[in-house]
Amino acid sequence: LWFLSEESGWSHLYVSDGKGAPRAITSGKWEASQPQLSADGKRFLFLCNRAWPGDYEVCEVDRNGGTVREVTALDGVEDFVVSPDDTKLLVRHSGSYLPPQVAVVDIRGGKATELTDTRTPAYKARTWIQPEYVQVPSKHGAGTIWGKYYGPKQLEAGRQYPIVMFVHGAGYLQNVSARYPNYFREQMFHDLLVQRGYIVLELDYRASEGYGRKWRTDIYRRMGTPELEDYLDGLDWLVEHRQGDRARAGIYGGSYGGFMTFMALFKKPGVFKAGAALRPV
């Protein structure tokens, strides 16, 4: 029997013979997901985010445990299947502005052979503002809050920039990753905002996926409080490190992000000068 468990505080792979306590095959402050047993039954393949929480690769480990090896080097693996002869992986992967594509990777490692490119010539001709993955220190004892920052390549000396903060939905969802975002439309809007002189920050606030059990469950019976603390810390970070103008800060989001927009406006009136709660729940 093999399964995933958060017993350690992080999602990891365990095996059990049904007689004794389950034994961990993987460990560490990262998450294992989508495990598959190889056709010969000798090793497990799974997704892992060992390098940083938003970097997903296919990893491999012996069925008895040991060293974990990263098979791919694509940064944004979405899912995969193993060939019947255990020699190749069919991988679906993506990037910040790269919609999911299909590639083949030798299971021993090596460069991916791309099978698809669904982007149009017009799309590929555009120059997009790439997100910067940032670590915002929590002033509320939560540790590191991962974020995606969009801004000009070079900040103008002495200039203060109006701020837009985006709140992802679902709660238990990871938005700060190297993958193509669920919120690709909002990402394109953020690209436009930067062209219009704004700076933008998205955060994987407490409740988000990919950061361990405690981060995911920290809002239990207090929804709307830890998440807002994280966004207030993000606002401080923009002011202190990206020349953000605290007097011109707005916030928006949809679904749970809409709920959090309301929480920000109602619980901290005056901090955000504008808010847009889209389809709030």
Where are the regions that the model predicts?
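Multi-bladed beta-propeller domains
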Residues: 5-8, 16-39, 48-51, 60-78, ...
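Short, solvent-exposed loop/turn segments at conserved positions within beta-propeller repeat blades
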Residues: 6-11, 50-56, 95-98, 185
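Serine-hydrolase catalytic core recognition
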Residues: 77-281
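A short loop-to-beta-strand structural motif that recurs across blades of beta-propeller domains
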Residues: 12-14, 57-59, 101-103
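Hydrophobic beta-strand positions that form the internal "hydrophobic ladder"
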Residues: 1-3, 44-45, 89-90
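Short catalytic-loop micro-motif centered on adjacent basic/acidic residues
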Residues: 3-4, 202
